[in-house]
């Protein structure tokens, strides 16, 4: 087992999640939710910091095989879910860590289940993050990350095989990373198209964004 490449990959993933956490932080800044803003900035810093520390691990080989793919997939799912649940807990929106983890995993897996009886009273930054997890998971979390991760050789294929439910991986183009980029490019375009239609229908911008995040391609959760 090439543990070094697994942890290095996990480091990349956590740094990416740290960057993604800045988006709900920006929403909190716009709406003047200073406590929520601080929580997102702290969570982003911790995620990026841990990720950078793991990223410094130098593997002997940058190519990994199926067993490394399964290990990396499992660890990535655990860590991104735990870090994604932190803002719910620290802001007090979902005080119970288990409930917060359930809400986060439900978002990343687009399950659509929720422990929240109503979402209208949540801070806008939390609403943004909750809906954004659905959008990230809409095409598969690791498919999204595959489009960003700097892997080599057959590493992308082995990682996607570990994430995919079927016995084989279908590709639009020879490179798996290019396939992931094409798929998320189409996904992003469809999201923007839905957003435009919602705005034409006179839905407020913020609510339109949350609705587009949660309903592009599939229905996952109610928007406020």
Residue spans for each PLM region:
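Conserved small/polar residues in nucleotide/adenosyl-binding loops
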Residues: 219-224
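N-terminal alpha-helical transmembrane segments of multi-pass membrane transport
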Residues: 1-99
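Cytosolic juxtamembrane amphipathic/interface segments immediately preceding
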Residues: 1-4, 60-64, 164-178
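Transmembrane-helix bundle segments that line or gate the permeation/cavity pathway
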Residues: 81-117, 124, 134-159, 186-188, ...
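Membrane-water interface regions at transmembrane-helix termini and the short interhelical loops
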Residues: 28, 53-66, 121-131, 148, ...
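Alpha-helical membrane-spanning segments of integral membrane proteins, especially the hydrophobic core
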Residues: 119-139, 170, 174-182
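Pore-domain transmembrane helices of cation channels
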Residues: 43, 47, 167-194
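Juxtamembrane inter-helical linkers in multi-pass membrane proteins
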Residues: 154-175, 212-217
